[in-house]
Structure formats: C-alpha cells, structure tokens
Amino acid sequence: MTDSLTLLRPDDWHIHLRDGTALETTVPHAAASFARAIIMPNLVPPVTNAEEALAYRARIEAQIPAETPFEPLMVLYLTNNTTPETIAAAKAAGVVACKLYPAGATTNSASGVTDIQHIYPALEEMERQGVLLLLHGEVTDSAIDIFDREAVFIERTLRKVVADFPKLKIVLEHITTQQAAEFVAQAPDNVAATITAHHLLYNRNHMLAGGIRPHYYCLPILKRQTHQQALVAAATSGSPKFFLGTDSAPHAKSRKEAACGCAGSYTAFAAIELYAEAFEDAGALDRLEGFASHFGPDFYGLPRNSDTITLRREPWSVPDTLTFGDESLVPVKAGETLNWRVQK
C-alpha cells in the first residue's frame, strides 16, 4: 500500500466559483491544487460575451493568493441569441469554450438554450474558431423522469450534434450514467467527458436511503449504483476521453438545508484528495495522473503542467462548515475523515 503519490499538477475542467465574496473562499480552494480551471459562466446575469468574461476573470484573479500560479479559463454561456460575431470576439479575447445549458436544466440556467437549432450558426463559428462546446447533457421536458434525462439527451440531441459538427470538440460534462460513458467511449475522438469526484464516490442511496441528505443533491442527480460503477470503470480505464471536472458547486448552508434546496455539491476544498480516495477504492491509483493531469489538457490542445503535487496518506477530519461570504457552506464529507492530503 502506497503512502505517497506524486502527480503532475492537475487541472479542473469544470468548476463553479460563483461571484462576489464567494470568490474569497472558492478561488483559493481551487488554486491550492489546480493550475488551471474551466470557469462555469452561470452567474446572475450569465457571462454571455467577451467583455463580461474578461471582467469576471479579473474578479477571479483578484482573489488568487500571492505566489500561487492559477489560470482561470473562461467560458461563455450560450443563449438563443448568441451570434457568430459573439463567438469570434470571445475567441479573440481568449475565451476557450462555450457552455450549453438547456433552459431550466440546473442552477441559473433560465437564460439557456430552448432549442439547439437556434444556436447552429454559433456552433458553426465555434467549429471554425476552435472553441470547445461544453454540454450540460440533460433534457428539461417535465414528462421525462429526472433519473432518465441524461440518457434521453444523448438520444434526442447529442447524437445529432456530434454528426452535424464532426470537427467541433465537444465535452459532455459531469456524466452520471452508463449510457453516457458508453456513448463517449464509442464516439469520435472529438468527443470527451468529465466526471466528478462525488459521482465516483456516491450513488442515490447515499442521498435518499435512511433520510434525505441535501448536500448530496446535485444536477445531474446521483444515479443507481450500477451507473456509479460504470463511471468508476470509465474514469479508471486509462481512456483519454475521460478526465477530471469537479463540478464543485457551492451554495450557502441555508440554501441547501431548505424545503426547496439548491443543487450542487462542494468539493473544491479537497478535490484531488476526493478523487484519490475514489481511485484507491477502485485499486487504480496508478491511473489517477492520466485522468487528473494528462487527458484534459491533451483534449483542449493545451500543454500539460510541468510542476507536481504530492499526496500523502494522512487522515484528517473535514470541517463541518466552511466560510462562504457572510454565510457558511457544508462541504462534501463534512465531519468525516479523508485519508489523503496534498503536501503543502
């Protein structure tokens, strides 16, 4: 049994940092272990153009701790009104990707796309410009069961987009089902997926059996154990199509522990440690570096990081709460023990 693991410094290819005073917590947490992060644009109002992306990046950069190299990679939020000109301007400003949220699919997605045909001209420009398409892969049809919405999205929307845009790099984010893992594995090389730590560690029993545990509630929702096992198999397979994206999504404790609680699990405080636990449980610690540090930059066409981090087996207790602006935040594994810790 190994007690130490050194990795090329990883990146987070999907994170929510929020805005305002929340950045005082989320940015240092992300920057502690990751060199780069793909920053989700679902603010209120959302980040829909180059000017807003640059302003948001500046607010993030203002919270990066001194002597800490961390690069926020900015993303535009696609709407029915996103134009090819908007895409071209974003590319020129350094934006690397655009995010498709089906309207109403998740937190702050009301401005999202109602019909993907509306954004085909924007997708064509993204394909030309080399801007990636990031997908929240769920339908929002109220007639579709919440546990089936990812699988239906693949059949109803994703297959056609992949066929229509063969040169567009597409990331199906935070996959949660066996169907998604199988689709991505069999798709052309321009299609990849991110997988969260919490979807590797948990299934819907953790959220629902013996009482409702709101801090496991996220979207796409945790699925049954067979899907969790398929995700673990994909993440630990060594396939370059699957890489790290935490989807760390903070909400104040009062907004989670409520009659109508918000969706999102907070993992950025110890993300790589949580992944290490999942990979160790699967007997695949030797596959963690590829998943966390190699395959994401390779897919994005960016260089791998050159520095390293070291994880040590050092059990520690996760705090019950963390500071979150003027409120508190309950992290994943609050009050429990994590067995790995990044050496400072």
Curated annotation (Swiss-Prot):
EC code: 3.5.2.3
Cofactors: Zn(2+)
Keywords: Hydrolase, Metal-binding, Pyrimidine biosynthesis, Zinc
Free-text remark on how the cofactor is bound: Binds 2 Zn(2+) ions per subunit.
Catalytic activity: (S)-dihydroorotate + H2O = N-carbamoyl-L-aspartate + H(+)
Record-annotated active site: 247
Highest taxon, organism lineage: Bacteria
EC top class, as a word: hydrolase
Keyword match Transcription regulation: no
Binding-site residues for Zn(2+) 1, renumbered to this chain: 14, 16, 99, 247
InterPro entries the UniProt entry points to: Amidohydro-rel, DHOdimr, Dihydroorotase_CS, Metal_Hydrolase
Binding site for Zn(2+) 2: 99, 136, 174
Gene3D superfamilies: Metal-dependent hydrolases (3.20.20.140)
Molecular function terms, GO-annotated: dihydroorotase activity; zinc ion binding
GO cellular component, one term: cytosol
Keyword Metal-binding: yes
Family: Belongs to the metallo-dependent hydrolases superfamily. DHOase family. Class II DHOase subfamily.
Protein role: Catalyzes the reversible cyclization of carbamoyl aspartate to dihydroorotate.
Subunit description: Homodimer.
PANTHER family: DIHYDROOROTASE
HAMAP family: PyrC_classII
Protein name in UniProt: Dihydroorotase
Organism: Teredinibacter turnerae (strain ATCC 39867 / T7901)
Species lineage: Bacteria, Pseudomonadati, Pseudomonadota, Gammaproteobacteria, Cellvibrionales
